[in-house]
Amino acid sequence: MSNIEIAIAVVVVMTLVGLMFGLVLAFANKKFAIEINPLIHIVEDILPKGQCGACGFAGCMAYAEAVVINPDVAPNLCVPGKAPVAKMVAELTGKAAAAVEPKVAFVKCAGDLSKAVRSFEYKGVQDCVAASLLQGGPKGCQYGCLGFGTCVKNCPFDAMTMSDTGLPIIDDDKCTGCGKCKSVCPKQVIELVPLGIHVAVNCNSKDKGAVARKLCSVSCIGCGLCLKNCTHGAIKIENSLAVVDSAICISECNESTCLAKCPTGAITTYIKAVPKQA
């Protein structure tokens, strides 16, 4: 038997074996196939497809499957979709949709390149997580934004850009409040705040006043003037940092007296009002 004949025989045998396995797999696929509820795909189609995981599930498909199959999974967990998506999911699944409070990301740091002290010059990987592993990062303030844009790179909705001053800028019209940027920030500088809040503290420092002021010219120094001048009790001092109670600030405040009293300008007016529901 020549080499050519042997080669042909091998090809024929392998083809027959492959064909046999193909038939077996096709039969098994048809015999043991699990039917997927078509409603799952319908729900998935109305989700924003950001795959942000803010709902607590591993992507939009996973949430769609869970909300359709599991009666305990709420229809309003899609943060980017907000109230309109929650309403549609509720109608499709026959569940009650609770109100969704619209939120957007807010960077609690104003310490840009001109205002914050640098401890050293960083020449490593341009990533906030990587930079934070080296003595906490090059910024003197160990609580401030490092400015390498890890949040920008991870925003699934292109709602963030890096400014020339070394701080991220958030496009409030594009931001869905999914929290992806917050989850990747090693300094926990980004916070999700409700729309409609009147003021926000543009600082994340927990350092004492003298230290904070030395490291950044616009840091909160925990002096308490904002607290004393807030007539609604919406501000408190925690770990040398002013903290605003958003619920009180939204419902009670009509004039932000705390803004004028802040000696460093760490308290800032906020973004925009809550959009009217259709």
Protein language model features and the residues they cover:
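Strongly charged, low-complexity linkers/loops
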Residues: L225, I235-V243
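Ferredoxin-type iron-sulfur electron-transfer modules and their immediate structural context
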Residues: S2-N229, C249, S256-K261, G265-A278
